[in-house]
Amino acid sequence: MKKKNWIYALIVTLIIIIAIVSMIFFVQTKYGDQSEKGSRSVSNKNNKIHIAIVNEDQPTTYNGKKVELGQAFIKRLANEKNYKFETVTRNVAESGLKNGGYQVMIVIPENFSKLAMQLDAKTPSKISLQYKTAVGQKEEVAKNTEKVVSNVLNDFNKNLVEIYLTSIIDNLHNAQKNVGAIMTREHGVNSKFSNYLLNPINDFPELFTDTLVNSISANKDITKWFQTYNKSLLSANSDTFRVNTDYNVSTLIEKQNSLFDEHNTAMDKMLQDYKSQKDSVELDNYINALKQMDSQIDQQSSMQDTGKEEYKQTVKENLDKLREIIQSQESPFSKGMIEDYRKQLTESLQDELANNKDLQDALNSIKMNNAQFAENLEKQLHDDIVKEPDTDTTFIYNMSKQDFIAAGLNEDEANKYEAIVKEAKRYKNEYNLKKPLAEHINLTDYDNQVAQDTSSLINDGVKVQRTETIKSNDINQLTVATDPHFNFEGDIKINGKKYDIKDQSVQLDTSNKEYKVEVNGVAKLKKDAEKDFLKDKTMHLQLLFGQANRQDEPNDKKTTSVVDVTLNHNLDGRLSKDALSQQLSALSRFDAHYKMYTDTKGREDKPFDNKRLIDMMVDQVINDMESFKDDKVAVLHQIDSMEENSDKLIDDILNNKKNTTKNKEDISKLIDQLENVKKTFAEEPQEPKIDKGKNDEFNTMSSNLDKEISRISEKSTQLLSDTQESKTIADSVSGQLNQLDNNVNKLHATGRALGVRANDLNRQMAKNDKDNELFAKEFKKVLQNSKDGDRQNQALKAFMSNPVQKKNLENVLANNGNTDVISPTLFVLLMYLLSMITAYIFYSYERAKGQMNFIKDDYSSKNHLWNNVITSGVIGTTGLVEGLIVGLIAMNKFHVLAGYRAKFILMVILTMMVFVLINTYLLRQVKSIGMFLMIAALGLYFVAMNNLKAAGQGVTNKISPLSYIDNMFFNYLNAEHPIGLALVILTVLVIIGFVLNMFIKHFKKERLI
């Protein structure tokens, strides 16, 4: 057994040695000629030096212009013929420095443009252009690269000085132009204030004067009116309207006499009718019938008292007899008879269903109909989605919710139709899965085909027509304001003179007091204004008639009118919506078909289950046969319930006695009432006495009334004349009040127009003040720090003379003449291979000798744990010693500078301890699988090394653990990144590896060896 184990150990050792030799050969082949490349670059021309440019500059703004000096620097280098420049990312540049692709990396920092444009700063910061040379270069190559960077930097500084001088000259030129613009704006504001606001305000008091004159005139007319009216009332005689009331006024109407005769005749007729009808009423018959009914009610009441007990006895006897009959009945079906009948019935039904041709034909017909229906439904859904060439309008666009809202639908409707589009997509995917590629279907791409169509407004436009007649004494100007969303074609005629429809102010002929205005033209929507127009869908055209630049005499009291003629056309009806209607109709049709499709989907054509049907029918019959006993018990319970409720039923039937008594009392009262009526009819009615002698008074009263009415008529004629005179005065007052109302309206319109003009002028003046303030603020900043007191600002002068300086990103390594430097890649590879050998030694020892027990387990139960701690400590200490030795050798080989050696040794020790602890744990715990994982990590590292190209790093480099270690050492040796985080991670991994080696679980039966 021991011999066999040593054979296994020997084979594994040979495999490791072969792998190590192969790896060393591969690395030497890949990286060993780096020094040779460096020596050849010395002998070749300078254009063999490759320089990587990393542009991290962010654009800035200076004097309102975008500045990107990083791009300008790159363009400057593009004109350089002696060297090869490439613009790459920082990762690509660092990889190129690592594998020899680039000799120099120049980094343009992100604040390069911002710091370069510090012309206004008092103490500007220097700009640093960072660069780094590759590790391990020859001294001559390094000197050449330094010279290249210095030359490029000097040329770029010269260009920056030219830019600074150009910027200063531009600022002075802009200041000159802005001062002229300020003067022009001030002159325009003053002129507009004089013509647009000051002159109308001077004329404004005239409106108050006209209003005062009209109000005084109206007040005089009203006073005259009231005086005339009072005079008319005072001159009237109060006796004129007094009527003699000694007579009965209610009888003065001439028709009263005839009306009295008519009423008298009607009363006589009514008395005759009453006498004739009372003899025809037969009250005796009604009275006798009611008495007979009362007698019958008495007989019925006596019968109820004697028959109640007989009813109860009869019901009880019948129920007892029925109970005996039911109890004597027995079930005609025995248990055996039921089972035989079940068997025979089952066989009979099976034979009938199996040989029933009609049933089979019906099932086949149903199956064929279902298949045909499904085929037709799929074809209909296909036609609903797919657009046929040229003629088809019933297809579905691939529209979103936002597309529906843009087409004019509200949010609820948009959600509804968006859900239908999703159903169409779902069905499309299901259909394409079942069909070959050539028969696949898709929704039609949407490109605003159903959006609100404004093509007619763009191509044909909308007619603009208006006719208006304006009367005014002081209108002398027309201001036209057009809708900015439209192009207007046509003209405006004012008293026959034509003017184009455009934004303008037109001076009118003041000799005319009436203006006939005719607007006739076409407004076409601008293509670039379509989106703004759809917000309100209205076209506006304003014609404002008013007064401008009026110079009147001081005593001129004419009023000023402002007439606003505005045309607003809502063009919502001109937007085509046919395509939207067709699309919504197509979606609704698809929704209906898809619902039928989902209802029928999943129904499989299963064979008709004859057995289930037969069992159901047989079970129903057998249940009826077996339920005889249960039915018998239920009937007996019903009979018992009827017997219990019989007394209540009889009582309900016989309880009508109370109602009968009440009816008898009502009939007796009715008989008494009819007896009284009969007595009343037997008496003769008394005729009323009517005094007809009063009719003579009507003639005397009418004669006196005629005299009084004649006298009133004369006085009313005089009153009518006075009223007409008052009406004339009232009309005059009304005219004065109307004129006063017009003056007030004109005053209001003029005040409103003046307010609008004042607001416009105020906005313009505020804008001018803002522009002037901005210019003054910006101009104040220009070279405000060019002097420090009375002396020149030396810091700014030094910055502008030499703004950009170079900064060398120093390496940790020291270049010793022509000595080559080993690559960190080979260094990491050697450490990992050494850790694999160490791990295998511990693993082989444990397999041959067993677990290391420094303390016997017999003395304490915790001694096993202490042995594990000591074992992990031995493994970790071995890694520490190996790391210290390897670190000292590598430090001398890399020629690490004095200030960086301690950190370098610490990094190597921690890395070696991680490698040894992790690899030892893998071999001790999972054995062959652990060896596979170790070799896999090594293989990933080889693949990652092979993929390191100037174009960037591959995915393999990101998942390779050894690549991260390689990058850590490379970045440290090049002084690129801090290593604090890396040291913390390595320390954590050392602790994890130490703990894992403490808890090795040994299995009794090992399978993976």
UniProtKB/Swiss-Prot annotation:
Membrane topology summary: Multi-pass membrane protein
Principal location listed in the UniProt entry: membrane
This protein's record includes keyword DNA-binding: no
Keyword Ubl conjugation: no
Record's subcellular location: Cell membrane
Keywords from the named record: Cell membrane, Membrane, Transmembrane, Transmembrane helix, Virulence
Transmembrane regions listed in the UniProt entry: 7-27, 822-842, 869-889, 903-923, 928-948, 979-999
Annotated signal sequence range: none
Subunit annotation: Homodimer. Interacts with EssB.
Function, in words: Component of the type VII secretion system (Ess). Provides together with EssB and other components such as EssC and EssE a secretion platform across the cytoplasmic membrane in the host.
Family per record: Belongs to the EsaA family.
Protein name: Type VII secretion system accessory factor EsaA
Gene of this entry: esaA
